[in-house]
UniProtKB/Swiss-Prot annotation:
Organism: Plasmodium cynomolgi (strain Berok)
Keyword entries, A-Z: ATP-binding, Nucleotide-binding, Repeat, Stress response
Protein name, as recorded: Heat shock 70 kDa protein
Residue ranges that the Swiss-Prot or TrEMBL entry lists as coiled coil: none
Family the entry assigns: Belongs to the heat shock protein 70 family.
Amino acid sequence: MASGKASKPNLPESNIAIGIDLGTTYSCVGVWRNENVDIIANDQGNRTTPSYVAFTDTERLIGDAAKNQVARNPENTVFDAKRLIGRKFTESSVQSDMKHWPFTVKSGVDEKPMIEVSYQGEKKLFHPEEISSMVLQKMKENAEAFLGKSIKNAVITVPAYFNDSQRQATKDAGTIAGLNVMRIINEPTAAAIAYGLHKKGKGEKNILIFDLGGGTFDVSLLTIEDGIFEVKATAGDTHLGGEDFDNRLVNFCVEDFKRKNRGKDLSKNSRALRRLRTQCERAKRTLSSSTQATIEIDSLFEGIDYSVTVSRARFEELCIDYFRDTLIPVEKVLKDAMMDKKSVHEVVLVGGSTRIPKIQTLIKEFFNGKEACRSINPDEAVAYGAAVQAAILSGDQSNAVQDLLLLDVCSLSLGLETAGGVMTKLIERNTTIPAKKSQIFTTYADNQPGVLIQVYEGERALTKDNNLLGKFHLDGIPPAPRKVPQIEVTFDIDANGILNVTAVEKSTGKQNHITITNDKGRLSPEEIDRMVNDAEKYKAEDEENKKRIEARNSLENYCYGVKSSLEDQKIKEKLQPSEIETCMKSITTILEWLEKNQLASKEEYESKQKEAESVCAPIMSKIYQDVGGAAGGMPGGMPGGMPGGMPGGMPGGGMPGGMNFPGGMPGGGMPGGAPAGSGPTVEEVD
C-alpha cells in the first residue's frame, strides 16, 4: 500500500510547538496562543483522550473510539503501554500487570515486551513504543485539526521517576509518531509551571507537587521565585496509580461474585472482566463525590446478573495500603531537600486520582491541617505546563514565557562500577540538570590493556542492585603498573535527562564514549525507521478505510432513499407498476449484496452505486419532469439528510447540493445529514 504521510498534506507547515501529557490511562495536548494555553479537545469534544488503541478485522481505532468498543474486543484493545515502555518482560511489575490485561504480552528480542494482537485477520506484534506513538499521533492530529496547521515540534512529559531507558523509549515513540521531540520534561515540573506561571513577584515560595495519575506517582519539591522554577528534590513510584485502585475493586467483585454464585470464577473470561473493570472504574469515580456506589451488570457471566453496592469506607479499606504509601515519597523529598514540612507554602494536587477524598485527607493531616491548592485542573495541568515549555523552546516572544526559567533535576544517581562491584556515583540524584562531572580512575592490574566502563543508575551501594544503563570498552592503554594509568571518565547529562559518558586515557589521549541507548528499552535506529514507515502505512490504511466506509454509506443512503420514495403513495401514482418493480428489484438486490459484503472495497461500492443509478435515475427523474419543479419535493424525506422533502423541487432531474440522481451522488452522503462514515458510534451500555 502506498505510504501516507502522518500529517495531512494540505496543511501548511508550522513552527508552533505543542505540549503533550502522554498518560497511562488518558492523554492531553495543549498549545500556547495569545498569552495563554489552549487545551485542545478531540473529535468527541473531550479535553482528555483515552490512551487506548484497538485493532479489528477492518480498522485501527485510537482514543475514545477504541475505549468504547473494549468490552466487545478486549483481546485486541491495548492500554497501559506506559507501564511497559522501557521495561523488560521479566520485570516483576510487568509480570504482575499481565494478570490484569486481557491482551497478550510476549517476550521479544533482549527481553523487550511485545504486545500481540489480531489486526485485519493477521497476528501482529507491536512494541510499547509503537502503541504510545499511535496515541501521540492522535494528539498531534487533534492539535492539527484545531490549529489548521501541520505540527512537527512537541514537548512530551514523563513521570519524574522514569529512568533513562523509559525516557529514551518515550522519545522514540514521539519520533515514530512523526514528531520532533524538543524536550522530555518531568510531569510534576510541568504541573508546577501551570501553577506558577501567573503567580510572579510574590517572593520565594516552596511548592510541593503531588501528582497521582492513572498509573504513575510523583512528588516534587520546587522553589519558585520571579519566574525561576528550581526543582529541589523529586521522588515517586512509576507503578502506582488509579489502575491499581481499580484492580483492588475488580478483585473484590470477582470474589464477591464467586461467593454469591457457588464458586463461579469469572476471572478467566476476558469480556466479563473488562465489563466489570469499566463499572469498577465508574464506581471509583462516583465514590469521590458520593459515599456509596452501585455496580450493576446484566448477564455478567454465564447469564448471571451481578449487583453490589460499595461504600466509600469499603473502597478506602481495600486500597488503604496504597493510599498510605503515597506519603513515603513526600517524606523523602522533604528529607532530600533538607526542608521541614512547615516550610512548604503550597501543596498542589495533580492527576485524576488526587480527587479521592481519603488521599486529600491524608495529605491534609500530614501537613498539619494545611488545605491543598486546587486552583489548577488536575487532568490538564501537566499538558498546560508542557505547552508553556514548548513555547519557550520554540522561541515565543511573549512576556509571560520569556522570563521563565526551568531548573530540573535528575531523579536517580548515576555512576559506574569499580573493583568489587561497588557503585561509584559521579552525579548524585537531585542534581540540577544539565550537569557535567568528571573523575579520574585507574587500572586494577599490572599491564592492564583496557578497561570496561559499566554505567549504572540507582541508589544502592552495589551495582548488582542498581540498573545497568550501558557499557563500553576503552582499549589501547600502554603497559604500566597498576594504578599508574589515568582514565578520566566524564558524565554529561542533558536537559532531557539523557546521559553521555566519555572515557579518555590521559597519556595517549585515546578515548571512547557512549550515549546511553541502553538495550533495555531502546530501539535501534533501523527499528525506529521501520516503525516510522509502519506508522505512515497504518495512517494510510486508516484513510483508505474511511473512504471505503464513506462509499458504503453513500450506496446505502442512495438505496434507502430511492426505496423510501418508491413506497410513497404520491410518487407511486406517477410511475408505471413495471417501473416501480424494476427499481425495487435493483435496489433489493443491491441491499442484499450489501448485507453480505460489509467489507467490500471502495471501488466495489462505487460500482454498485453506478449500477443502481443506471437503473433508477432515469425512472426517478420522470417524477420531477412531470411536476416541473413544483414545491414540496420528495415527501417524507430521505434518510441520511433529506428530511421533510426538498423545497424548490428538482427541475431538470437535478437535486441541489450535489445530489443529481441522473448523474449519481458525488462525494457520498447527503446534505443535512451526518457526514458519511461518521455514523453513530456504539458504546457499551450495561
